[in-house]
Every structure is written in C-alpha cells, then in structure tokens.
C-alpha cells in the first residue's frame, strides 16, 4: 500500500454517544485502517452527544471508503456524511476575474468604459504595439490544451482537462504574478488547433501549450512559433527538460562527474524525452542513448515516426542496440519519462559507480525509488512524497515572467538553459546533498531568479 496523502483527504461528520473515549476509538480505527488522522474538530457538544469532524488522509478512493467503514463499525459511532476535500476545493472552479480599477463614480465609469475607452482603442489602432502597455496583454498567458494527453489520464477531452488547466493558471499567478487563463479546445486536429490559437493570440502575451499528445504537439508548437510574435512554450516538453537539466547539474556535482563525460540513458521518446535530449546536448552531453518500448533507438531501426527518427539520428553515436536493460550497463545516468514499473531495482546494478537515477513517471515511477537507492547515489522522482521532486512548477512561472518582462517574441534554447542554471543555483554548496538537488517548489526565490536569468538571456530591450 502507498502513503496516505492530502490528494485523497476526506472529512467525516461523526456522531458519538456519551462515551468519553469515543474520539480515541475512532482515531485508532483510522490508524488501524492505515489512514492518517489530520484533524479532529468538535462541532457540537451535549451531555449525550458529541458531533465531530474527523479529517484523514488515504492512499486512494477505495482506501478512503475502507477507512469510513472502519470508523462506522465502532460501537456508538455513526458516520452521517463524508466530504472529499479535493472535490470541495474544486467546487465552482479555482479561478476568478478580479478588477484592478475601482468603479465608484461616474468619472470612473466614463474612463474605464465608454466614452473614454474609445480614445484608448484609437491609440491602439494607430499603434498596435501599444496593446502591451494599455491592456492586459503584457501580463496574460493562454494555457492551451486539446485534452489529448492529460497527466497520466490520457485522452480525456477538453472539459475533463479544465481542472488541470485551472491549476496551471493558479500556479502562474501564485508564483510569478502572471495572469493565465485556460483555453480548452474542442478539437484535436492540428490545423484547427493552430488556427484557433492564432485567432485568440491578440489577447495574450504568451501561449503555454499543455497536455497535447505527441507527435501532434511538436507540429503545433513549431507552427505557432513561426506564425506568432509572442512566446510559445510547450511545458510538457520544455518545463520538464529545464528542471531535469537543473537537477542533473546538481546531481553531477554530488557525484563529482561532468555532463560531457557521462553516458545518459533515456527511457521515453515522446514530448518530454525529445526536449530533454536537446537541452542536455546544448549543455554538452555527447553520449545519450534513448529507448522506447521496443528498445534502443538507432539509425538502422525501421518504422520510426518523424520524432523518433530525429532522436535516432541525433543520439547513440556508438550505434548501440538491444533493450533498455542492455543500454543501462555502464551508464552514468538514467532518466525515465515513460511509464510505471518498467524496471526492477536490480536492473540498475550494472550501471556505473555513483549512478544517477531520475524516474519521473507519475504517479508511479519507472522503478521503485527505495529499491533504486540501493544501486544509485542520487535518485529523483516526480512525486511530492519523495525527496528530489522534479516538478515543472520550478520552471514555467519564472520562464514566462522573464519572457513577458523582456518583451521576448520567442523562448530560445539559451533562455531555457539560463532557467535551468538559475534553478540549480538555488541549492547552495553547503546545502547540496544526495537527497537535496533541487529547491522546494515553495522556495519564493526560484521564480524571480529564473525570471531574471531568462530576461537577461532574452537579450532584448523590453517592449513598451
């Protein structure tokens, strides 16, 4: 069984009789059912009745049901209601539009809206660049998805993707002050996605592509980067790649190795995998071997799509063949952006001394982290309940903050590398250790540091 977490947190409204040990009995029941008690709040107290709200964390929904049954089985305890705290948090959505301008007088109204707003409209019509300083455009990002590759849920459609996009927008605002808004498109046709974003672009200062399946995501991003004069950034690719580079730079410091001299094995040749390859090569990695479900990608393999063909032609200089396990022999680094449980811990044993393992599949990594630590000096995952969490939130808020502030028209590879270096630098020499190679997602210095680095790397004077 996994570890109880807040993502499966419930609150039970429990009625207890006069038994003074009632609270102790129900909290014990939660513990015996392998749950974690978070809080006990007394709602009502009477001589013969005690009403409490019992909040606890579970491993999953089925486990939460089992905990509820265990509490209800206690003599004298009656569970009257159960609330899923995650669903409660999402009621009515997680975002709202707030006004920056007071509307208390006729003067306020005549300046914010008609007739005064017409003068501003004419100014922008005469000089469209003024939209950046006279509208929300300079600080607004569209979070665009077609719902085709949402988290580990797959192709669930635009409506079901909306809670994730809301969460993304929330992170933009919380960590970098960027006003982001979900744009969930009811199409998975590449031409229609590109056209829709082009039509919407005048109202935004940047476009964050999210959860669009490969290989479609590559063409969508490429075409939008060519046609728009605002930054376009596919976070599943580049956000992941930036944080992987940051974490790997620090992990290599821990084990005393250089990226140029290491052999990296990568599992997963989708959106994130391709971006990781590109950013590592930009930083000097020369020995990268990529694998998919069928094994090592190499130039002689047939039946590869365009993205995998690119990977085969730009990696694996020694022409290695075989399986993922074959590729791991003697490798210094394993990076997994593929699927759960594809490796056993002992599969890592043939790796080089002081190996580095990044098993980033979510929610279940490619290899058990505890088992991986028997064979690797540094282990990272994508999970918040494990040390060294590789989380895109370390990158994308600051990347867009810096790009928007610089008035950048695109996000270059140099800007991505600068972001990675800024993230890595947040872990100081006296803090660096095998279980601390990336800063906390709640480190308030990360986004400003990334923004400054990106702004400097943009090499452009801010557009007014």
Give residue ranges: language-model regions.
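Rossmann-like adenosine-cofactor binding region
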Residues: 309-378, 383-385
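Adenosine-phosphate binding glycine-rich loop
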Residues: 231, 235-236, 255-258, 359-464
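Flexible, glycine/charged-enriched surface loops at secondary-structure junctions
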Residues: 38-43, 80-82, 183, 210, ...
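Short, structured coil segments at secondary-structure junctions
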Residues: 75, 176, 227-228, 284, ...
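Glycine/serine-rich phosphate-binding loop and adjoining beta1-alpha1 elements at the start
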Residues: 79-262
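Glycine-rich phosphate/diphosphate-binding loop of Rossmann-like nucleotide-binding domains
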Residues: 151, 156-176, 228, 234, ...
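A conserved regulatory-domain signal marking ACT and ACT-like small-molecule sensing domains
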Residues: 1-93
């Amino acid at each position: 069984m996994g570890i109880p977490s807040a993502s499966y947190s419930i609150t039970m409204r429990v009625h207890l009789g006069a038994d003074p040990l009632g609270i102790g009995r129900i909290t014990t029941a939660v513990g015996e059912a392998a749950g974690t008690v978070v809080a006990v709040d007394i709602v009502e107290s009477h001589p013969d009745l005690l009403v409490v709200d019992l909040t606890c964390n579970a491993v999953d929904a089925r486990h939460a049901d089992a905990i509820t049954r265990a509490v209800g089985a206690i003599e004298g305890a009656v569970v009257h209601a159960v609330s899923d705290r995650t669903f409660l948090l999402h009621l009515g959505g997680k975002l709202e539009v707030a006004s920056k301008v007071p509307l208390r007088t006729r003067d306020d109204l005549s300046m914010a809206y008609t007739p005064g707003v017409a003068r501003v409209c004419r100014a922008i019509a005469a000089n469209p660049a003024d939209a950046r300083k006279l509208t929300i455009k300079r600080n607004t990002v569209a979070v665009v998805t077609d719902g085709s590759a949402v988290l580990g849920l797959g192709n669930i459609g635009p409506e079901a993707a909306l809670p994730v996009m809301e969460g993304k927008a929330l992170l933009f605002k919380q960590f970098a002050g960027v006003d982001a808004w979900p744009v969930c498109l009811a199409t998975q046709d590449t031409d229609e996605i590109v056209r829709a974003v082009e039509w919407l672009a005048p109202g935004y200062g940047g476009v964050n592509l999210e959860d669009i399946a490969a290989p479609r995501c590559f063409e969508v991003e490429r075409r939008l980067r060519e046609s728009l004069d605002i930054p376009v950034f596919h976070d599943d690719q580049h956000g992941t790649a930036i944080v992987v580079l940051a974490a790997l730079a620090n992990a290599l410091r821990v084990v005393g190795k250089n990226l140029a001299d290491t052999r990296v094995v990568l599992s997963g040749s989708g959106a994130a995998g391709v971006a990781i390859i590109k950013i590592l090569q930009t930083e000097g990695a020369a020995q990268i071997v990529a694998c998919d479900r069928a094994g090592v990608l190499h130039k002689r393999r047939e039946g590869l799509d365009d993205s995998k063909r690119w990977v085969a032609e730009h990696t694996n200089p020694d022409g290695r063949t075989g399986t993922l396990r074959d590729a791991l022999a003697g490798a210094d680094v394993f990076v997994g952006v593929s699927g759960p449980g594809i490796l056993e811990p002992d599969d890592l044993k043939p790796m080089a001394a002081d190996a580095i393992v990044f098993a980033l599949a979510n929610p279940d990594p490619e290899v058990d982290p505890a088992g991986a630590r028997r064979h690797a000096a540094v282990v990272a995952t994508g999970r918040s309940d494990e040390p060294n969490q590789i989380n895109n939130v370390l990158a994308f808020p600051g990347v867009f903050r810096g790009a928007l502030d610089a008035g950048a028209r695109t996000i270059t590879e140099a800007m991505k590398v600068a972001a990675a270096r800024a993230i890595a630098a947040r872990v100081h020499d006296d803090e660096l250790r095998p279980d601390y190679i990336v800063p906390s997602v709640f480190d308030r210095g990360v986004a400003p540091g990334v923004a400054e680095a990106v702004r400097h790397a943009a090499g452009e004077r801010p557009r007014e």
